[in-house]
Regions:
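A glycine-rich dinucleotide-binding beta-alpha-beta segment and adjacent secondary-structure elements
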Residues: 205-257
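Helix N-cap/coil-helix junction residues
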Residues: 6, 161-164, 225, 278, ...
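Active-site-adjacent "lid/gating" segments in soluble enzymes
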Residues: 2-147, 154
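Short low-complexity, flexible loop/linker segments enriched in glycine and/or proline
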Residues: 9-11, 36, 225-231, 296-297
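Flexible, small-/acidic-enriched active-site or ligand-binding loops
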Residues: 235, 239-285
Length: 297
């Protein structure tokens, strides 16, 4: 950005209240500082691909652009905090955020649970990744999050292992949390194929947190997703008919809607310059010279 005259020092000299956020892949120091970074690369370096390991794959991706999105959320948090600070200080600031640091911080609390406590005499947790196991039936999968003794009693009865109730491995939260890989093993092979609907009925009755595993093809027809208004469909000039999530933050007394697609490059160039008081002749000269991009819809 310095090369094109848009560096932090240059712009903040013009406007001391400017909040300038610089996002990098690996940070501004170290042997990888100047290397290109994309989501896949950060997933690998930050431990996400190890987190997703299985018996079949020692390393695997989380199959969504999670590192891009985590970094974006981190930038939003930083910008919001800096804006609030500026109310008091009347000053802007320069903020550096690396994808690697943001994603390592995101993954660490549960993904590195077993590496957080360094003293041998402290309570040693199982890796958080060991806590995830789907119960698979012929007609689909069930996601469960058993925590309490009563949850596990209901769950062990449901998957057909009542003889394990009260055994040392399952008897206490402490035992379960330190042996999570062994504890969750029974969910891989339920002794009866009772099906998803019956499993959900049993778990809900026992107050065990659970849900059926949705196919992505079924999300638009989900009654719960419809109930909270999480998706909307509208028509745009450029892209035609779209179905997208509505903004998930619900402010009191306000309807939430995406309302329209993101603008195309140059779609609002003319109107922005008009708003800034630029003469139409000057705008036309910039368009004709190729210096200003205009997209007419």
């Amino acid at each position: 950005m310095d090369r094109i005259g848009l560096g932090s020092n240059i712009l903040r000299e013009i406007n001391p209240k400017l909040i300038y956020i610089a996002v990098s892949g690996f940070g501004t120091k170290g042997p990888m500082a100047d290397l290109p970074a994309f989501d896949h690369v950060i997933q690998g370096l930050a431990g996400f691909t190890d987190l997703q390991s299985s018996d079949e794959n020692p390393f695997d991706f989380i199959k969504t652009f999670i590192c891009d999105k985590v970094t974006a959320y981190t930038v939003c948090q930083a910008a919001t905090a800096a804006l609030l600070a500026r109310v008091t200080t009347k000053k802007g600031q320069h903020i550096d955020i690396s994808m690697l640091h943001a994603c390592l911080s995101f993954m660490w609390p549960d993904g590195m649970m077993h590496k957080t406590l360094k003293d041998d005499d402290r309570f040693n947790m199982s890796p958080g990744s060991d806590y995830f196991q789907i119960i698979n039936y012929k007609d689909g999968g069930v996601a469960v999050a058993p925590l309490t003794d009563s949850h596990w009693e209901a769950l062990l009865n449901m998957v057909g292992y009542p003889e394990l109730i009260g055994t040392p491995l399952y008897a206490s939260l402490a035992s379960r949390m330190t042996n999570m890989d062994k504890v969750m093993e029974v969910l891989k092979s339920p002794r009866k194929d009772i099906g998803v609907d019956k499993a959900i009925e049993i778990l809900v009755t026992a107050d065990v947190p659970c849900s059926p595993c949705s196919s992505r093809d079924d999300l638009e027809s989900s009654e719960q997703i419809k109930a909270i208004g999480a998706l909307e469909t509208y028509v745009t000039k450029a892209m035609g008919k779209l179905t997208v999530p509505t903004p998930p933050i619900l402010f009191e007394g306000k309807e939430t809607s995406q309302a329209d697609a993101s603008p195309l490059l140059g779609e609002h160039s003319r109107s922005i310059l008009h708003e800034l008081g630029w003469a139409q002749d000057t705008i036309n000269e910039l368009i004709n010279s190729g210096e200003l991009k205009i997209t007419e819809i």
